[in-house]
Amino acid sequence: AYEKAVKGYITKRKPLGEALDEEIMDELSVKFGIVDDALEDLFKQIQDAGISIVDKDGNPSPLALVTDEIEKEEVSDTAMDEIVTNVRIDDPVRMYLKEIGRYPLISLDEETKLAEAIIAGGEGAEFAKQMLAEANLRLVVSIAKRYSGRGMQFLDLIQEGNMGLMKAVDKFDQTKGFKFSTYATWWIRQAITRAIADQARTIRIPVHMVETINKLIRVQRNLLQELGRDPSPEEIGKELHMAPDKVREVLKIAQEPVSLETPIGEEDDSHLGDFIEDDVIESPVDYTNRILLREQLDEVMDTLTDREENVLRMRFGLDDGRMHTLEDVGKQFKVTRERIRQIEAKAIKKLRHPRRSKPLRDFM
């Protein structure tokens, strides 16, 4: 079943030329218990098929290297000091790093005993889970530092990674040959990357759509290098086996919101919002024209009788913006609809006289 699954996966990914490291772990490694040397063989088999293994950002995956490199994750006291130096952090983070520094690292034998206690269950299982999790809190910090600067605070990344660590503790089975740090790495990375997908953007995009966007952007970047120009949706769709309309939809979803407070110019004294026209609020020119038109209209209406003026104002909504029916106006003046129609026709005829209409023609 495993070999069949690997062949099926390679067949599925070969047209794209790339495979996500997380996807390989979810669909093959974790599912079939592939670890250590067998995991290296799996990565090699996929790469030998001409498929590049990348992370979610399209960069060569560090996980496609020797698995032992993950097991040798730098989580020593020296490495913790390096994190403090290289990652922009504030006092709460320093306090947290100092706190987890109190928990000692454990040996492979101790790890095995804790795992056995977890499997055995009972009162000792919860204590063993706590010990195993605390001993690997540094691993979470070391992994989280790779994702700093991607839209989430460092402490938030650590928190999400800790949730992945707890899931790894619950699911860990040492009888399958995993070293815990290797096994936990996948769960920690998955928790962090999913959190970034969910929370880093102003407008949340579902995880499956984030993966689609990443694939599309990688193909778009490759085509740009090959063609020397921006590829069309049709060209991108051909590479991804996706309809051009779907490509356009994904590209639209992928757009990042831009703040109206974004500084413009070298002096930073102007903002993007200053240059965007408000098509809802009336412009000064339109406002001035409307006031002048109102004044001219009032002067012209003053040449009519009071009844004629009031009928036109009601019929055309000149005062309240609401046009009234002949019946409504007739009730107001206690006459028939026909009489109102006659008064309206007579008033309009008067307004069409050149002497009255000339002042209004400039506004037409």
UniProtKB/Swiss-Prot annotation:
<keyword id="KW-0731">Sigma factor</keyword>
<dbReference type="GO" id="GO:0016987">
    <property type="term" value="F:sigma factor activity"/>
</dbReference>
<dbReference type="GO" id="GO:0005737">
    <property type="term" value="C:cytoplasm"/>
</dbReference>
<dbReference type="Pfam" id="PF04545">
    <property type="entry name" value="Sigma70_r4"/>
</dbReference>
<dbReference type="Pfam" id="PF04539">
    <property type="entry name" value="Sigma70_r3"/>
</dbReference>
<dbReference type="GO" id="GO:0006352">
    <property type="term" value="P:DNA-templated transcription initiation"/>
</dbReference>
<dbReference type="InterPro" id="IPR012760">
    <property type="entry name" value="RNA_pol_sigma_RpoD_C"/>
</dbReference>
<comment type="subunit">
    <text>Interacts transiently with the RNA polymerase catalytic core.</text>
</comment>
<dbReference type="Pfam" id="PF00140">
    <property type="entry name" value="Sigma70_r1_2"/>
</dbReference>
<dbReference type="InterPro" id="IPR036388">
    <property type="entry name" value="WH-like_DNA-bd_sf"/>
</dbReference>
<dbReference type="Pfam" id="PF04542">
    <property type="entry name" value="Sigma70_r2"/>
</dbReference>
<dbReference type="GO" id="GO:0003677">
    <property type="term" value="F:DNA binding"/>
</dbReference>
<comment type="similarity">
    <text>Belongs to the sigma-70 factor family. RpoD/SigA subfamily.</text>
</comment>
<dbReference type="InterPro" id="IPR013324">
    <property type="entry name" value="RNA_pol_sigma_r3/r4-like"/>
</dbReference>
<dbReference type="InterPro" id="IPR014284">
    <property type="entry name" value="RNA_pol_sigma-70_dom"/>
</dbReference>
<dbReference type="InterPro" id="IPR007624">
    <property type="entry name" value="RNA_pol_sigma70_r3"/>
</dbReference>
<protein>
    <recommendedName>
        <fullName>RNA polymerase sigma factor SigA</fullName>
    </recommendedName>
</protein>
<keyword id="KW-0238">DNA-binding</keyword>
<keyword id="KW-0963">Cytoplasm</keyword>
<dbReference type="InterPro" id="IPR009042">
    <property type="entry name" value="RNA_pol_sigma70_r1_2"/>
</dbReference>
<comment type="function">
    <text>Sigma factors are initiation factors that promote the attachment of RNA polymerase to specific initiation sites and are then released. This sigma factor is the primary sigma factor during exponential growth.</text>
</comment>
<keyword id="KW-0805">Transcription regulation</keyword>
<feature type="region of interest" description="Sigma-70 factor domain-3">
    <location>
        <begin position="211"/>
        <end position="287"/>
    </location>
</feature>
<dbReference type="InterPro" id="IPR007630">
    <property type="entry name" value="RNA_pol_sigma70_r4"/>
</dbReference>
<dbReference type="InterPro" id="IPR013325">
    <property type="entry name" value="RNA_pol_sigma_r2"/>
</dbReference>
<dbReference type="InterPro" id="IPR000943">
    <property type="entry name" value="RNA_pol_sigma70"/>
</dbReference>
<feature type="region of interest" description="Sigma-70 factor domain-4">
    <location>
        <begin position="300"/>
        <end position="353"/>
    </location>
</feature>
<feature type="DNA-binding region" description="H-T-H motif">
    <location>
        <begin position="326"/>
        <end position="345"/>
    </location>
</feature>
<dbReference type="InterPro" id="IPR028630">
    <property type="entry name" value="Sigma70_RpoD"/>
</dbReference>
<feature type="short sequence motif" description="Interaction with polymerase core subunit RpoC">
    <location>
        <begin position="156"/>
        <end position="159"/>
    </location>
</feature>
<dbReference type="InterPro" id="IPR007627">
    <property type="entry name" value="RNA_pol_sigma70_r2"/>
</dbReference>
<dbReference type="InterPro" id="IPR050239">
    <property type="entry name" value="Sigma-70_RNA_pol_init_factors"/>
</dbReference>
<keyword id="KW-0804">Transcription</keyword>
<feature type="region of interest" description="Sigma-70 factor domain-2">
    <location>
        <begin position="132"/>
        <end position="202"/>
    </location>
</feature>
